[in-house]
């Protein structure tokens, strides 16, 4: 099984085949090494996306603090970001344009969401940011020094857990929308906190899949636009992780 992340699918990360046939009918693979995916290039794209996200999130936060309604940013940014994700998952060659756009609109979403949580629990945003990047660095070091190796079994377990979480969230959201059902992960009970911790663990494990696919994409010398594609997939995981940390910290804070 491959990563459930729409930006880390099998077909997108297959090695490109550029075939040249000479006059005698001999076939050879031609690759332009100046136009292929690299790890350093993906890192640079990830940093550019992070900068865009931080700038737009900061602007949204500032506007919300001065009296603007955060809901248009929250809903609009989230929906448009989701649409860009869907388009890029089917048209990865457009990632050069879609990835920066995703970072921009996701910044609107993150800025509005952060402002809402910060208003309720002062100091929670810096804690969530710190927890997110600490988790990222720990996972990166564990992957870099081969403490954690991404095997097929590892992928299967992580993907299965992630799909289960997605289905659970979708079903409970629909039930809560149209019935009086109260999902167990709502509120600040110990069980709810435990579920949040479990989801954070699964989100963190997805980082290993992201690292593995980016590394293999570079090894396979994929097209240059796959740097944006890989960076976009990594950004999705980081945003998910940050949102889950916000939720966990808010549950803990509300118990005080």
Where are the regions that the model predicts?
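A hydrophobic alpha-helical transmembrane-helix feature that marks the membrane cores
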Residues: 1-256
């Amino acid at each position: 099984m491959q990563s459930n992340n729409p930006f880390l699918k099998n077909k997108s990360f297959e090695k490109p085949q550029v075939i040249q046939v000479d006059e005698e009918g001999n076939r050879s693979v031609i690759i332009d090494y100046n136009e292929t995916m690299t790890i350093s290039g993906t890192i640079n794209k990830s940093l550019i996306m992070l900068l865009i996200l931080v700038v737009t999130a900061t602007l949204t936060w500032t506007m919300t603090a001065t009296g603007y309604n955060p809901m248009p940013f929250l809903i609009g940014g989230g929906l448009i970001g989701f649409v860009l994700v869907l388009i890029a998952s089917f048209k990865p060659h457009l990632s050069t344009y879609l990835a920066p756009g995703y970072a921009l609109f996701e910044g609107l979403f993150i800025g509005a969401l952060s402002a809402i949580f910060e208003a309720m629990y002062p100091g929670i945003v810096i804690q969530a940011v710190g927890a997110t990047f600490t988790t990222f660095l720990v996972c990166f070091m564990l992957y870099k020094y081969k403490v954690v190796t991404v095997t097929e079994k590892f992928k299967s377990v992580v993907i299965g857990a992630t799909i289960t979480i997605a289905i659970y969230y979708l079903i409970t959201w629909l039930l809560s929308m149209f019935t009086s059902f109260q999902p167990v992960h709502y509120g600040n009970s110990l069980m709810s906190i435990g579920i949040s911790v479990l989801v954070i663990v699964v989100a963190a494990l997805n980082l290993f899949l992201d690292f593995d696919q980016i590394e293999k994409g570079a090894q396979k010398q994929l097209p240059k636009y796959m740097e944006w594609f890989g960076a976009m997939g990594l950004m999705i995981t980081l945003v998910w992780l940050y949102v889950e940390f916000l939720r966990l910290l808010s549950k803990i804070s509300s118990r005080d």
